[in-house]
């Protein structure tokens, strides 16, 4: 049987696999904000990125290792392909963290070996022990993944796993890379690994899965029953294609059905000991932060964190809930951090009151960031009678999107009505040469006119593919959250902003999307799965020695 830590370890890969969602690219400050919140949430491991991808990715992982890596905090992990260049870059990036891990991988399915790696099984059997041993010479905590394990020949898979453990791997990850398996198949795969790998008792079994068939969470729960003790997941289930296994769904399934799962941990069914170390009351805030910063809107009927997750429309259901919530609710909304708390902050509230409330909400801002947040708070308070926690969340989350901005919006002025053509006047500052230009455009509506004017000024070709707006809170003076997604060269970039004026919010969101596009094209990143190992050269290391 594999090594059993006595509970489930939560491995969060929002900043690595989650960021690979189309349009979900994050800047350094955004990644730091999410990493800090993941630490508050209580995840065991943060996979901070793929350091070899680009100098920007290396810097982000290194900064997270410095700022978030603590003795009593999460393990900071980086991803590396099974090559010395990748592994060395990963080690250098995570080295500042007291608790660090190198996560290296290679594909084991025949379809990947033939068409992607152009390698034989014999090649893989040589590469795995050599690269795991090299990683082990740098750090003690090594995770090894057999990419596309669920479509690999079982006997070959067992052989690869045995070699990886013998070379020093302490965690063996079994990915369902394309979301192919069903729960019973995935559970049997984990059980068979436990039976057929002689040294599996020296490593923790981890699972990683995608949601292409909508089965990722179900697969993971079946894996837990068969001995998996680390779950690799993302906030809101974001990730490539249909996404990854959802952290909040997994955690709350284990929380709500603890009496069922306790027996698989050799506990009494009524044992009160939690199955994870997650602080569930941080779930909603974490979900909103990730949604705001990535621009990936959470569907209303999403389990646990969707807007309708605790809503009841049916009169029969409403009557039952009013009499006893347990009639139709299996989770207390407060357990995941939802509350009806409305604070009495307004235009007369001072800096200390705002700081105190932000600290209560878990935000630890520097003096400079607090000054910026307070200025935004006062501006909003002049336009809105009451400031709620959701308003403060919107202020803080938008604030961390500002760094690395080539363009800054200076002026938005719109004229529209049923008897006139919508016209927008926009002034845009180019921070690279400190020049400001103004353009006027006509559109089919005020937002279209704003986007046309911004395109004239920015001169960054793109296609607008999504515009959405939703209310942050109730009331006619509520903040409107706007998400805009643009496309260029088959890549998608998101922008997000909130304002009491949705046209101003749309303008800011569009500028944010343009800034992401420009910044992303400067990064010139490589993809951990799609780019060949031949890209793993020492050139990167020489440029990032410091």
Curated annotation (Swiss-Prot):
Question: Which Cys pairs does UniProt list as disulfide-bonded?
Answer: none
The catalysed reaction is:
3-methyl-2-oxobutanoate + acetyl-CoA + H2O = (2S)-2-isopropylmalate + CoA + H(+)
- Per UniProt, Mn(2+) binds at 17, 208, 210, 244
Note the PROSITE patterns from the entry: AIPM_HOMOCIT_SYNTH_1, AIPM_HOMOCIT_SYNTH_2, PYR_CT
GO cellular component terms, A-Z? cytoplasm
This protein's pathway: Amino-acid biosynthesis; L-leucine biosynthesis; L-leucine from 3-methyl-2-oxobutanoate: step 1/4
Q: Which family does it belong to?
A: Belongs to the alpha-IPM synthase/homocitrate synthase family. LeuA type 1 subfamily.
Subunit organization: Homodimer.
* Protein name, as recorded: 2-isopropylmalate synthase
Q: Which lineage ranks, top first, belong to the organism behind this chain?
A: Bacteria, Bacillati, Cyanobacteriota, Cyanophyceae, Synechococcales
